[in-house]
Amino acid sequence: MPNFSYSDLLPLGADATKYRLVSTEGVSVVKHGDKEFLQVESAALVKLTHEAIHDINHYLRAEHLQQLTNIVKDPEASPNDRFVAIDLLKNANIAAGGVLPMCQDTGTALVMGKKGQYVLTTGKDEVAISQGIYDAYTKLNLRYSQMAPVTTWEEKNTGNNLPAQIEIYADSDHQDEYNFMFIAKGGGSANKSFLYQETKAVLNPTAFMNWLDEKLRSIGTAACPPYHLAIVIGGTSAEATVKTAKLASTKYLDSLPTTGDAATGHGFRDLELEQKVLELTRTLGIGAQFGGKYFCHDVRVVRLPRHGASLPIAIAVSCSADRQAKAKITKDGIFLEVLETDPAHFLPETTDEHLNDDVVAIDLNQPMAAVLAELSKHPVKTRLSLTGTLVVARDLAHAKIKADMDAGKPMPEYLKNYAVDYAGPAKTPEGYASGSFGPTTAGRMDSYVDYFQKNGGSMVMLAKGNRSKAVTDACKSNGGFYLGSIGGPAARLAQDCIKKVEVLDFEELGMEAVWKIDVVDFPAFIVVDDKGNDFFASTSTPLTINTRPEN
């Protein structure tokens, strides 16, 4: 008979996180018999949650900021790598002012709590945490992104960014503590969480790296690299594998053991494989969105036990808006992870002018034919500086325009006369022309492109991420262009580039309305041109699932 042996599946080491004291109110120690209990008032949970949501939308970890600085200083980084890194550092400095959030997609609020067995609370914890999320999203300049299902087919924005994902677990290792992880997860990076059901054929170094090369290329740039990449191999269930990948991408699992154990089967980090995967990402050619070396800042690889008949593998990313913070409540008070509130010292002396002299200025207020003629002179990957008027339209606006055209209405003149930016702003602070304003994922609008262009609209499109071959074919056939906008620096765009915003159509759609904006020196790159060239075509391979790799 085998011996009984137990280990936590994810045995974490000591917590080295630096915390700051938020408050001592609402926390006390009470005795029941000979036991001491930590009593936490609901108000303390509300306050902690509000503070956490504020901080993770405005501040980043110092380690993340240092990684951006390292890109700028790396002589092997491409000019486009360095440009993106500097723009993200500028964005971090603006967001740290506490007014404009770092990204316009202020995310779904995710809260994981681990409640010690000697912790007492005065109400339902999920209600108090939800109240804190509500307070943060309604009082700060954040965006409401949650869609409530009214029927199976009909949805309505909840108008307060609730509901949140809240998961609370019992914790016997920290009996008189309440520990938390707060995450603001935007749609771009959430959509790049993948589960693959593979076989043991993948479990050798050559086969795995060949398999992974293909899968990493398929991630593309829609989730705003440079990424913190997480890969989990194995798992007791598919859902456990994906959840572990999400936690690994936040660095929550960094203190895992670095070797396995045949007796208990606990998970561990493979540091050697992490380095090999990081080296692989630097050869893909994708870089920090528009070509180069820095597709990823770093990599985490976690190996988990598995059923002999199953091999789930999960891939997840945390994006350039690397938004999470740990927190804890102890007898000493309420504590929140220390994030960098003064990131100015991470900005290097390098200026935009030192990065690349080949920046092409585009006057968007010319007739569309003149804009197209100017763009046609330049190859893909060319960096642009856009000045003039853009219209902004994303998913719901495109659907409504298509429905109107199907009903016999003409293509709106604004889509014929102006370049269209796929975006949606956060709330506009008092005294600002715009709230945080950045691109959404272009691929969701791919099905409209050929039809719209054949009717004279969407000839110049601006968004983030790679697109399907159908868009490349449409642009070649119709003479159009797709320009890549940097994913991530939404606060900088709002403060420095956007001078005027007004609703143009479908006002009832809120942030998904059609907007007209005036921009100055708005950065972009040519990704797809009118000759059938696509920057991303050289960096991608067809995606296969559950295919036996070459050994």
Predicted regions and their residues:
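Non-transmembrane, aqueous-exposed alpha-helical and coiled segments at domain scale
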Residues: 1-231, 236-355, 435, 453
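Glycine-rich beta-strand-to-loop/alpha-helix junction loops that act as flexible
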Residues: 229-236, 387-388, 463, 487
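Feature captures the catalytic cores and cofactor-binding loops of soluble hydro-lyases/lyases
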Residues: 255-285, 289-290, 392-522
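C-terminal binding/interaction regions
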Residues: 292-299, 306-307, 496-551
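Residue "hotspots" at secondary-structure boundaries inside conserved domains
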Residues: 373-376, 413
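Short, well-ordered loop/turn sites that connect or cap secondary structure elements
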Residues: 375-378, 384
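Short, charged beta-turn/beta-strand-edge "cap" motif at the junction between a beta-strand
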Residues: 383, 389-393
